[in-house]
A protein has these predicted regions:
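Secretory-pathway glycan-assembly enzymes, especially type II membrane glycosyltransferases
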Residues: 1-278, 283, 288-292
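Eukaryote-biased feature marking scaffold/signaling PDZ-domain proteins and nuclear chromatin regulators
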Residues: 99-101, 115, 246-248, 290, ...
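Structural signal for hydrophobic/aromatic residues that build the beta-strand cores
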Residues: 124, 128, 135, 251-253, ...
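Donor-binding and catalytic core of enzymes assembling or modifying cell-surface/extracellular glycoconjugates
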Residues: 291-351, 358-359
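SH3/SH3-like (including bacterial SH3b) beta-barrel domains
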Residues: 367-398, 402, 406-425, 440
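Long, low-complexity intrinsically disordered regions
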Residues: 429-440
């Protein structure tokens, strides 16, 4: 295997010791294609899971990240890009003269839960970044801390938290007003080119080279800036980590029940979640010892704790996890995935969702590109030609996804997931006048 890997990546080595964009894209496509094909095969032929070699294709391609010699470069590039965005956000949020700064006002108290409200602030922050406005977060009376955001997290600015200004106006009423009020994403009219799904063009080249889902990396950077704990909050979390002996490797399992089931999401048994946890640890055992299998369980149903302890006694039940098993229909699940991708290089595939593909509520459509042709085998499937642009409604996690073909105008039909590429980037042009990247 080592010889095959060396032959593979030696074809893409450049003169300065960095992998080419083509190499990184091909490596990532190889991994995602094998993963999607594996889901197809395992769904059609369940007994194949009993074979001792069942994980070897995934293990072989995962090994490229270590065997190709670029791990240090990826880590450094990840840290450099993240540092660039964090410095830009810090500059934007801390103007030298708050009384003259252009501002975007966001009301935290959207009528929804914690995860939804965090995504609302991310949306506001992304819009502020695109418009070059300082984000002013109104949070007094917040349901999760009546004193406001600052009772749990640090303020988003050290120098500018007042919404005062010489002129005020609603979204797009007058782009020149000093203080603009932003509606929730559901009511945003006209729509904006900055909405999630898009990433800035000045970092797109570097970002597509190091990450399999640039959109989630981009969103994760705003969470990284936002979620800076007050000392009391950090102390509480540190104490909890010591109390439960939080150690890696660990899989995060988020099981949402109660009000979600039957309305926004279907019921999924504990066994469905834990089968993917067990699969992860089986793969890990091939390459390293695992003295104790641990999961970090988050759920709104107390009975789940008892059920997992009874059915899986070999697990220690404890989002700095190495892998996530959850449902992307849940905002909290998506928040955990976004945070994970802000902390480690390219964690795009470190998850298993039991329902939806990753999305940001209110975002622009998911666009994918067909890289292999397909002839429909059943009335539920669609034909594909190489280059077809598709919008994705969801991944069935059995090797098939559902979507619409913009060329043939076939809607809500199935196609093999491994025959399409990851979502194409939507770029917005934004030339920062400050803290520009020194390379693309």
């Amino acid at each position: 295997m080592e010889i095959r890997i060396k032959f593979f990546f030696s074809c893409f080595v450049d003169a300065v010791g960095q992998p080419s964009t083509e190499y990184e894209a091909l490596k990532r496509k190889l991994h995602s294609g094998i993963l999607e094909f594996w889901w197809f095969v395992s769904s059609e032929v369940k007994k194949i899971r009993k074979e001792a070699e069942n994980f070897s294709p995934l293990l072989d391609v995962s090994g490229l990240n270590h065997a190709d010699g670029y791990a240090t470069w990826r880590q450094n590039e990840f840290e450099e890009l993240s540092s660039l965005i964090q410095r830009r956000l810090d500059y934007l949020q801390n103007p030298s003269d708050c009384s003259k700064a252009k501002k975007l006002v966001c009301n935290l108290n959207k009528g929804c839960g914690f995860g939804c409200q965090l995504h609302h602030v991310i949306y506001c922050f992304i819009m502020a970044y695109g418009l070059e406005r300082t984000l002013i977060l109104k949070s007094k009376g917040w349901r999760y801390g009546v004193s406001g955001w600052e009772s749990v997290f640090f303020p988003l600015s050290r120098t500018c938290t007042s919404a005062n200004g010489s002129s005020h106006g609603p979204w797009r009423a007058n782009g020149n007003v000093q203080v603009m009020n932003l509606p929730i994403i559901d009511s945003l009219t006209p729509r904006s080119k900055f909405l999630p799904g898009a990433v800035p063009n000045d970092i797109a080249g570097r970002l597509t080279r190091i990450h399999g889902n640039p959109t989630v990396w981009w969103i994760g950077q705003f969470l990284k800036y936002m979620l800076k704990y007050q000392p009391a909050t950090k102390q509480m979390l540190d104490d909890f980590g010591r109390k439960v002996n939080f150690q890696n490797p660990i899989v995060g399992v988020h099981i949402r029940r109660t009000d979600k089931v039957g309305t926004e999401a279907a019921f999924h048994s504990v066994e469905e979640y834990m089968s993917h946890v067990e699969e992860y640890f089986q793969q890990l055992l091939v390459s390293q010892p695992v003295p104790q299998k641990r999961i970090y369980l988050a759920t709104d149903d107390p009975k789940v704790f008892t059920e997992i302890r009874q059915k899986y006694p070999e697990y220690e039940v404890l989002a700095r996890t190495d892998f996530l098993v959850c449902t992307f229909s849940s905002q909290v699940c998506r928040i955990a995935y976004e945070i994970m991708n802000a902390l480690v290089p390219d964690a795009a595939d470190h998850f298993k969702s039991l329902d939806d593909v990753y999305y940001f509520g209110g975002q622009e459509p998911h666009y994918h590109v067909a890289v292999l042709p397909h002839t429909a085998k059943t009335p539920q499937e669609m034909n594909l030609k190489v280059g077809d642009i598709l919008t994705i409604a969801g991944n069935h996690w059995d090797g098939y996804s559902k979507g619409s073909n913009l060329r043939s105008q076939v809607y809500a039909s199935l196609f093999p997931s491994f025959k399409v590429s990851v979502n194409a980037l939507i770029l917005f042009h934004f030339a920062y006048k400050f803290l520009r990247s020194n390379r693309n």
